[in-house]
């Protein structure tokens, strides 16, 4: 919402600077998005009076004027404006004055007639682009006065605020003024009476034919209005700052009331309403044609306002094009309606939001509806004339639309919340300034929030509301009363674990990304087949209608997006929650913290010293081993080849930590690769961090001063036996000794009948207390080979 500071000061004018006023708006919980100064400088622009207006040629609009601007002689000016006439006061740009667009006024001939200045419209002043008629000033403004001195063009500031859904009071001048009054402990804002007497008895009967919907409806007929009049300048200026100014007087009046008191109103052509107003649910396939000839087919859950034969409008001021008033309309129907938020949500599913729907989504104060009707009537009749009919009212389930929460606020809870003492009299005064109804007892208050605060539901809401007026800066800073000692063994290490992993991956060339937890269910089905999806009841769209079971869909979507933008080498990782069905959990849903990554395309950038190659399984496996080495230790995890749905059957594996499954890695399945238009070299990994409960803590020890002793062996073993199983047995055998085991050769040939493979394994022995003797090393190695022969039927090659 945008507004100008002078408009706000018409409602509440504390003796503080503009900067302080803006700071108080922020302190009240309303964010200021932008501030712009309005300080027009119109040198040489004077108030003049047309004393003579001659039209020498009837076929031409040009008029020859004599204008008095307070000089010794009258100015000759040529003007073509349609509203140019004798005895009106105007704005005159004199010779050598400069227009806002940079043009300089000079003496010139127009149609052989000398012109010594320009009669200005708002358009020439750079204010209202569609106002091409010359400005007509009030009669009481003296001739020759500089227009910079006019009140209507004085310096001002316009402010744009952003309002959260829980603060509808910030969507109007009235709401902001109430907050400023409370902060400065000023008198409550009182609404001026705007009631005009009725002069006719005409009205439309109103019926509500829906039991489930909550509706509060006001309507009034106003006859014999003149909608061909110009909008008053004071209203134009305010709406200009709000970016809501139009050339339609009805739109301007409705927007003025919307910004000033936060009440949406609607106006229809009364002559086209057939006898009655009926509020009902739409009939299947019923439609509405809008002003731009757009046709909207309505569902049965859409609330409509109709007459006997047609729909008039639906909530959000989405009107039937036939009912829109124009400048020739003489009789209008002024309405105010309030419906429940469910009705608004049903409409938002069907069409895009607009300014009026935004107000209804935030919440509208039901207690101001009648006042808004009276205020709009007052403005319409004062500006456009007309005869006023009575206000007709109809309500259904009104209690659900009004704010009537009774909340118990304990003094002790308030002080405990801020860990300080605030006297009960101060709290009571703030509550009264905020216009709560208060019943005070010895230890607590019964409070009733004002009608415009729909967000105040519980005691903590009231405490927060009091504190924004009390000012958080007034709460003293106090140290913790208790010393806390954290045991690293019991402390939750998931956050530092993630940070440690993130730093390592970034150092290896990965970029961290953040994707939505809501994803497209069809994409999830492709990547994770045969899954139980968690679908969202009211999704933003179909692409965001399922909770993610894995980080992979988001990672692959990011790779696809970047590939389509000429990126040839990509490494991404993400950390976030994934969700799955688990009846043993609260709400039947389990959430786990996952870490996932993807590599795709070329391994490195193009260079002169090596041939570019695409990434492969072992590139990802190497990154993952480095990661697991940091977070849980190299000896604790295993990577086992297993088929995984969504991954290539020959290039996929599962990761185990202490024999518990914690994740997967592998190449994306060719079908998915083709569907997502990915490189033929895309590899993924994912780790569940719920099982990784602690970081690896390193123990330091002295380096042995004794030399190492190395032995190499070559063994024949079945191709079906993974090397991981062999090295695990060897490590278990040497668990209490310092032995480093490494695979340095793999060999296979026809001599082995293609059923066996030869493995070259090195053993490096070392002792911290003595120099190992040859027979000791040979004996340990002999015993290890003996176990391998027994368990895997290995044959020692010579």
UniProtKB/Swiss-Prot annotation:
The keyword rRNA processing does not apply. GO terms for cellular component: phenylalanine-tRNA ligase complex. The keyword ATP-binding applies. Mg(2+) binds at residues 455, 461, 465. Residues 39-148 form the tRNA-binding domain. Residues 704-797 form the FDX-ACB domain. One of its GO terms (biological process) is phenylalanyl-tRNA aminoacylation. PROSITE patterns: B5, FDX_ACB, TRBD. It holds the Pfam family B3_4. One of its GO terms (molecular function) is phenylalanine-tRNA ligase activity. Its cofactor is Mg(2+). Binds 2 magnesium ions per tetramer. Belongs to the phenylalanyl-tRNA synthetase beta subunit family. Type 1 subfamily. This is Phenylalanine--tRNA ligase beta subunit. The lineage of its organism: Bacteria, Pseudomonadati, Pseudomonadota, Gammaproteobacteria, Enterobacterales.
